[in-house]
Amino acid sequence: FFLTSNTFTMLLRNTLLYNILFIVLNIVIPVTLAVLINQIYSRIASKAYQTMMFFPHFLSWVVVSYFVYAFLNPDKGLMNTIIQFFGGDKIMWYSQPKWWPLILTFMQVWKSMGYNMVVYLASITGIDSTLYEAATLDGATKWQQTKYITLPALKPIIVMMFILNVGHIFYSDFGLF
């Protein structure tokens, strides 16, 4: 009975759409962050950013949800404080269903982006520096170096991380849900 009901169809659709969104964002955002962090010349600043972004990976979902609750608290949350500072009305994030897809997506991406970013950053540091030196001598901008050297070199790692993220769909615990 359940497999033929509208509820099953809705649950399957929502699960697939969320996971597709998670997979796309868990590739685009960490690759972007890894490229940006690789451009930081200060080793101390680079390591500090890596640590701050990697930290949520080690937290349980309960702790992550508490951080997000504190961030989106209707009375004292950072988001509502900023909105009210600019003259807007506070938003009841948790009582309006339209915000839940955004909240769930934000939580999942925030928790997992650090790990993925470190994997991509490790791959970027393994790219031969003579390629960048030759590109600089040929007059390539940083964007051109990223587009024609960094991203093609990351392609195998992006494919591997995509496959691993697809495998996470089949976890039976549905930790976020």
Segments predicted by a language model, with ranges:
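A structural signal for multi-pass alpha-helical bundles of membrane permease subunits
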Residues: 1-177
